[in-house]
Each structure stands twice: as C-alpha cells, then as structure tokens.
C-alpha cells in the first residue's frame, strides 16, 4: 500500500532508517514532526535533530511544535489528512485528539519485544540485563505508555559483547524493515492485532549519571554489562588518584580475594581490578579530558601498580 499518506514523527538517529525506508519505498510522506531545535555548545549554535536533517535532505516539510495539545497544532496536523501517523522516539506524548486523526491509527516502533521493557530505555536495559535476544515491536499507540496492541515483532540475537550503541544501530534497521512490511499489509496486520499481556509487562527508566559510576562491590558480570550498557553514552566511570577514568571495555576474569576496587594485576596491555565477585581485566579506557584509548596506551603514561585502588567520588 505505497499510496498510504503518512505523517512521520521522530527525533533521534534511531528514527532515521525508518524515514529513509518509507521514502525509498514510495510512501507519500506529507510531513515530518520533530522536536524543536536546540542550542548546543559554548557558541549556542542551533542544532537540528537527525530526523529533521534527513527530512530536509529528502525534501519533506518539517514541523516542530512545542506541544501537540494546542488546538491549532492539532488542526494543522489533521489538515494533512494522514492515513497513518508513524511515531518513533518522537519525545512527546500524543493526546487522544491526535491519536484519533488517522484512518489506521498511530503506529509506533519500540526497541524491545513488548510487553517487556516498556518506557524510555529498552535498548539499554536489554544489554544491562544480559538478554540473549532482543528486537522491535510495531504497535498501535493508545493513551498508555507502550501499552497498545501489537501488530508485529521482529527478533535479533545479541552478541556476547553487545553494546547499547551496536544494538541501537541493529534495531533501528530492523525496525525500518518491520515497519515497511506492516504498512504494505496494514489492514491484515490490524485485523490480527494482539493485545499485550499486562502480567508480563516490565518498565525501564532513563539511566542517570549516578548509575554511570562504577560500584566495585558489585559482581564483575554486573559491572561488565553496565560498561556495555553505557557505551556510547554517557560511559561508565571510576576514580583514580582523584581523576575521573571512564571504562569502555573489560573482560570478566577470576578475582584474587582483595578489597573491591583494588588493582590486582598490571601488564603492558591491561590491568585487572577486583570486584565484589570476580575481577575485571580492563581493555579500553578514557582518562579525564582525553579520547578513548586502549589500556596499553594509557599505561604508557602512568605508573600503575598492584595495590592501587579505584574509588567512588
């Protein structure tokens, strides 16, 4: 059904492959809605969202209202007469007045296998919890938070060293593929829409800066997952000699019974830190005010010895 008239709502990189796929397959994209521009950096330079940049590149009109609860904004949206509204990480809640506009409703691409991992950080939580499988869900939006009927799920296996960044990229492409399939057969998918099992629902919350500080009393497996969860942003960190040190890659190894946070081994290529259970061999770090680097490079410029301690602030 390439003749479907679509309004697309999205903001970050995750949404871009879907917008590109809809354009490539000839869907009629009447308009793109994205979050208002932000000022970034010391110079307060205006920064466009990735979705806005892609829409402008494709020649699609872009609207950036502060709210969707204004009657004039809703009327302007309704004037596009969309058959369906696609919502992918837009960043705003759609009121009922908007949900009721399109013939086929509002479709969302969510970065988990719902009803598991509803909320703001499904991709991060899949990595943090050590999931072997993740995926995307195409659902019909309702007034709840990720509670709508499911149209399609698509699964993917996680690599043992999967990071939030790598899974984000994979799921953004998988989501685009699943979305275009649903839109091509939308009436069939909506006839077979499946309500979510509320008894299986779990929720995620945004991961804050406090979560990013490594607690060496935790198990090595838990810390290693946290490191991958916070890659590429904001990065898990610890403190060495009063300076912040981000840890980007580590392997779980046997511990030595030392106090958590104690460095128990140092080689030319890496160093090993005792945790609450087991230890972590640190492979990649980022010293304060410097770029990411292999631990071998970091060790060339510092005298690190067994018995030194990594701390919390």
Locations of the language-model features?
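N-terminal Rossmann-like dinucleotide-binding module
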Residues: 1-42
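A residue-level signal for conserved active-site and pocket-lining positions in enzyme catalytic cores
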Residues: 10, 32, 55, 85, ...
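Short beta->alpha connector loops
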Residues: 11-14, 66-69, 90-92, 253
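Donor/substrate-binding cores of folate-linked one-carbon enzymes
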Residues: 25, 35, 84-203, 208-210
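N-terminal glycine-/serine-/threonine-rich beta1-alpha1-beta2 phosphate-ribose binding loop
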Residues: 39-81
């Amino acid at each position: 059904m390439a003749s479907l008239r679509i309004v697309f709502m999205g903001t970050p990189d995750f949404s871009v492959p879907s917008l590109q796929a809809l354009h490539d397959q000839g869907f009629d994209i009447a308009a793109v809605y994205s979050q208002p521009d932000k000022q970034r950096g010391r110079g307060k330079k205006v920064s466009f969202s990735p979705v806005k940049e892609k829409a402008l590149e494709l020649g699609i009109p872009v609207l950036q209202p502060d709210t969707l609860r204004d009657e004039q904004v809703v009327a302007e949206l309704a004037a596009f007469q969309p058959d369906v509204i696609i919502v992918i990480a837009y960043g705003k809640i759609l009121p009922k007045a908007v949900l009721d506009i399109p013939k086929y409703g509002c479709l969302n691409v969510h970065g988990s296998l719902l009803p598991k991992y509803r909320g703001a950080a499904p991709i991060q939580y899949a990595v943090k919890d050590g999931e072997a499988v993740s995926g995307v869900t195409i659902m019909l939006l309702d007034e709840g938070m990720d509670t709508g009927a499911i149209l399609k799920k698509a699964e993917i296996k996680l690599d043992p060293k999967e990071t939030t960044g790598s899974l984000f990229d994979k799921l953004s492409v998988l989501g685009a593929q699943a979305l275009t399939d649903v839109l091509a057969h939308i009436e069939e998918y909506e006839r077979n829409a499946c309500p979510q099992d509320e008894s299986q629902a779990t929720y995620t919350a945004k991961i804050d800066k406090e979560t990013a500080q490594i607690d060496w009393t935790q198990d090595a497996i838990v810390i290693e997952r946290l490191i991958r969860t916070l890659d590429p942003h904001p990065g898990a960190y610890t403190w060495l000699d009063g300076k912040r040190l981000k840890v980007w890659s580590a392997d779980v190894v046997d511990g030595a019974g030392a106090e958590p946070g104690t460095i128990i081994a140092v080689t030319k290529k890496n160093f090993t830190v005792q945790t609450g259970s087991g230890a972590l061999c640190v492979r990649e770090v980022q010293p304060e005010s410097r770029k990411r680097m292999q631990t071998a490079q970091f060790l060339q410029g510092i005298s690190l010895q067994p018995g030194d301690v990594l701390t919390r602030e």
